[in-house]
């Protein structure tokens, strides 16, 4: 199994972004959704992205943002990848000069494969926990047995991951990448560097155990 990529989402401070990169994270996520306790404004986001070392991917998370809002942010912040967490259609996600991930919130009975197929231009599909009225960052895991064996695209697993359970998640789901936010925080929006390192180590050690 190839090395699983790791994204630390909900970054709000330069020091947390640098700590994530130093721990070995492949990507950091910035939340552009005002209702989130982890939201960042354009000025802070630009500061964080500019501080990143080479080869660490910057991801912008959006929830039902307008094209005007997206354009304003993308003109100011050099994001590498977009992540759509709302009710966006495929056409809403495309045409922004960036590759994108589409997040799908999982609940029993979902046709996940069919829903994913509605986004043929997506670079990958992120699966997160369904909580009514909450687009993400719930801190709750979902039933990993619901994850299809093949989505036809890279699978990013999110939802309630922590240093304690991510090894089991990687072993069971075999995702392309894992995405964590609350599971490595000291408080909402503030990362705990020790928990970030523990999370990365748990993913990497699982990979080593399989080689």
Curated annotation (Swiss-Prot):
<dbReference type="InterPro" id="IPR001240">
    <property type="entry name" value="PRAI_dom"/>
</dbReference>
<dbReference type="Pfam" id="PF00697">
    <property type="entry name" value="PRAI"/>
</dbReference>
<comment type="similarity">
    <text>Belongs to the TrpF family.</text>
</comment>
<dbReference type="GO" id="GO:0004640">
    <property type="term" value="F:phosphoribosylanthranilate isomerase activity"/>
</dbReference>
<keyword id="KW-0028">Amino-acid biosynthesis</keyword>
<protein>
    <recommendedName>
        <fullName>N-(5'-phosphoribosyl)anthranilate isomerase</fullName>
        <ecNumber>5.3.1.24</ecNumber>
    </recommendedName>
</protein>
<comment type="pathway">
    <text>Amino-acid biosynthesis; L-tryptophan biosynthesis; L-tryptophan from chorismate: step 3/5.</text>
</comment>
<dbReference type="GO" id="GO:0000162">
    <property type="term" value="P:L-tryptophan biosynthetic process"/>
</dbReference>
<dbReference type="InterPro" id="IPR044643">
    <property type="entry name" value="TrpF_fam"/>
</dbReference>
<keyword id="KW-0822">Tryptophan biosynthesis</keyword>
<dbReference type="InterPro" id="IPR011060">
    <property type="entry name" value="RibuloseP-bd_barrel"/>
</dbReference>
<dbReference type="InterPro" id="IPR013785">
    <property type="entry name" value="Aldolase_TIM"/>
</dbReference>
<keyword id="KW-0413">Isomerase</keyword>
<keyword id="KW-0057">Aromatic amino acid biosynthesis</keyword>
């Amino acid at each position: 199994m190839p090395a699983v990529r790791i994204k630390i989402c909900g970054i709000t401070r330069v020091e947390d972004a640098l700590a994530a990169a130093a721990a070995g994270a492949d990507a950091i996520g910035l939340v552009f959704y005002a209702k989130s306790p982890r939201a960042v404004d354009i000025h802070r986001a630009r500061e964080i992205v500019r501080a990143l070392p080479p080869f660490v991917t910057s991801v912008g998370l959006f929830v039902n943002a307008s094209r005007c809002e997206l354009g304003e942010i993308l003109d100011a912040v050099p994001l590498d990848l977009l992540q759509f967490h709302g009710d966006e259609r495929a056409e809403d996600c495309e045409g922004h000069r960036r590759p994108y991930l589409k997040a799908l919130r999982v609940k029993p009975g979902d046709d996940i494969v069919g829903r994913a197929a509605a986004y043929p231009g997506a670079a990958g599909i992120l699966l997160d926990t369904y909580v009514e009225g909450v687009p993400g960052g719930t801190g709750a895991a979902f039933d990993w047995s619901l994850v299809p064996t093949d989505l036809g695209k890279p699978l990013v697993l999110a939802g309630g991951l922590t240093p304690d359970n991510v090894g089991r998640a990687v072993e069971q789901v075999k995702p392309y990448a894992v995405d964590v936010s609350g599971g490595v925080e000291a408080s909402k929006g503030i990362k705990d560097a020790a928990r970030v390192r523990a999370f990365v180590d748990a993913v990497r050690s699982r990979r080593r155990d399989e080689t």
